[in-house]
Amino acid sequence: MTELFADDSRSNRERMLAGDPYVADAALAQLSQQALSRTYEYERAYLEDPASARRILENLIGELGTGVDIRPPLRVDYGSNISIGEGTFINFNLTALDVAPIKIGADCQIGPNVQLLTPTHPLDPEERRSKIESAQPITLGDNVWLGGGVVILPGVSIGHNSVIGAGAVVTRDIPAGVVAAGNPARVIKQLA
């Protein structure tokens, strides 16, 4: 493992943020643990103290637009690599593994049990055993609607005003102004 990074003076976090192979070391584990703790604080505050809940989100999420509503529970790897545009609504149980940036546009609607998954692992079993991973960003344009249970895989972009049907697994980019559904998701309708 150390041989792979022998000529690279960057930290694992720096390699991770650059989209290069890295190992989730103790420093990254600590950041992830802090994010997990904040998500639990957010859950407790959501009903009892909305102003406090908003402050917790502002400290957890990298960029948070006005009027964003996220129903708990919320699960993130770090939170700091997520940006959410104004007026976006996120229903219960979002999992956003933000090893790479996750950009959610303005006025999006995200159904329950959605997964935004940026990490990827080597296909080669020996490389995978060494715990090396990398990630690719996910981008959702403005006014995107993700139905319940949608899974978005690493490197995917979804264009403005598109709808992804419930239960879809999105493995490649989806253009603007369409409805896509299925596993793997494919465009089934052009919107006017």
Regions found by a protein language model. Give the residues of each.
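Terminal amphipathic alpha-helical/low-complexity segments used for targeting or macromolecular assembly
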Residues: 1-67, 185-189
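Short arginine-rich
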Residues: 41-43, 172-177
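Short-chain dehydrogenase/reductase
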Residues: 145, 163, 179-181
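Active-site/ligand-binding-proximal alpha/beta "capping" segment
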Residues: 157, 171-172
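Conserved catalytic segment of ABC-fold P-loop ATPases
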Residues: 159-162, 175-177
